[in-house]
């Protein structure tokens, strides 16, 4: 009669792996490029090009009635038209029946959630590309790294503030008033600035920076917000735009769009803005073995006032 201990070395578990009931989180970058844009809607059946119009203000020169009976010269009213073309984007996932049959996880539900995440991320990147291609950026010169452009500085930020205020741009974010709390400070009514996470260390070094944790009131703050400098509140994302190897020493140049109210617009198509769908196996496959999930959405984008948006090109401090 044999003796010994029965253990996992001589009797391995029938199921060598155990499935955790909780999935690990799927990475998702900060979505910072859409929330500051004005939202417009396009009606169905009247074309894909959406026209947004603005009447320009009248001249304030002259206009005095001097008693001569001569009327002031009439002025022609000027209207500025900005067009946005609605575009459609889509993504599909084809799933074999064996995955659905044998996977422990509810894959169709999870894959649908992934497509929903794709919708939000794709929209954000499209708005990022609009800012990257349609804004006049000014090189930072106030830094100390000796590059062209330099890292971001208070003087550079003040220069963009001067430009926007000189063009009568309106701020987007309200004042956060001072409170009787240690190590906090108020924020002014502010414009929005969008930055890459690579320059967060440089933002901490900017003169007068107020990090988000030092705001007196944390209610309603977006997770993507990083800090406040002068009249700008900075929001950061790992996917914010940059130009590879464009600096004088071959390092990346980061573009930071900075804007006020009604500087940009996002157009959503009525009845088509975001669609998540499912096609069953008997439709997708001749032997009914593959099903399909899909997501699609329509979006139009435009810079609506070039005078109310500017930005900085910057590098990082060495």
Q: What do the PLM-derived regions correspond to, one by one?
A:
Residues 45, 53-56, 96, 196-198, ...:
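Structured loops at beta-to-helix junctions and adjacent beta-edge loops in soluble globular domains
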Residues 175, 180-200:
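Aromatic- and glycine-enriched pocket-lining scaffold segments that form the walls
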Residues 42, 98-109, 113, 183-190, ...:
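Short, charged/polar micro-motifs that form catalytic or ligand-binding hotspots
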Residues 76-103:
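Short acidic, glycine/tyrosine-flanked loop/strand segments centered on an H-E-D-like triad
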Residues 52, 113, 117, 193, ...:
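Hydrophobic alpha-helical segments involved in membrane association or supramolecular assembly
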Residues 102-178, 317:
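Alpha-helical scaffold segments that mediate packing/assembly in large oligomeric complexes
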Residues 1-85, 309, 316:
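N-terminal "assembly arms/tails" that initiate or stabilize quaternary assembly
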Residues 2-33, 146-172, 191, 198-318:
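Sequence/fold signature of self-assembling virion shell proteins
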């Amino acid at each position: 009669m044999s003796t010994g201990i029965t253990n996992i070395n001589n009797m391995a578990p029938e199921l060598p792996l155990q499935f955790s009931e909780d999935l690990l989180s799927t990475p998702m970058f900060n979505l910072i490029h859409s929330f500051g844009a004005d939202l417009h809607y396009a009606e169905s059946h009247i074309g894909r090009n959406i026209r947004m119009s603005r009447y320009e203000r009248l001249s304030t020169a002259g206009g005095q009635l001097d008693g001569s009976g001569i009327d002031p010269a009439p002025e022609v009213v000027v209207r500025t038209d900005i067009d946005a073309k609605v575009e459609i984007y889509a993504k599909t996932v084809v799933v074999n029946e064996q995955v659905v049959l044998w996977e422990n996880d509810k894959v169709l539900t999870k894959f649908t959630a992934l497509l929903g995440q794709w919708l939000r991320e794709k929209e954000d990147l499209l708005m990022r590309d609009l800012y990257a291609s349609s804004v006049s950026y000014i090189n930072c010169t106030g830094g100390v790294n000796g590059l062209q452009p330099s890292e971001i500085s208070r003087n550079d930020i003040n220069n963009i503030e001067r430009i926007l205020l000189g063009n009568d741009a309106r701020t987007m974010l309200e004042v956060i008033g001072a409170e009787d709390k240690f190590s906090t400070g108020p924020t002014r009514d502010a414009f929005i600035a969008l930055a890459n996470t690579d320059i967060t260390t440089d933002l901490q070094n900017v003169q007068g920076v107020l990090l988000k944790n030092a705001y007196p009131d944390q209610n309603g703050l977006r997770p993507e917000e990083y800090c406040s400098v002068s009249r700008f509140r900075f929001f950061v994302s790992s996917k914010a735009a940059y130009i590879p190897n464009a600096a004088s020493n071959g390092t990346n140049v980061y573009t930071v769009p900075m804007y006020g109210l009604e500087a940009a617009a996002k157009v959503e198509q009525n009845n088509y803005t975001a669609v998540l769908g499912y096609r069953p196996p008997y439709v997708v496959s001749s032997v009914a073995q593959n099903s399909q999930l899909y997501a699609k959405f329509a979006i139009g984008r435009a810079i609506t006032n070039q005078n109310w948006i500017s930005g900085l090109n910057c590098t990082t401090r060495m």
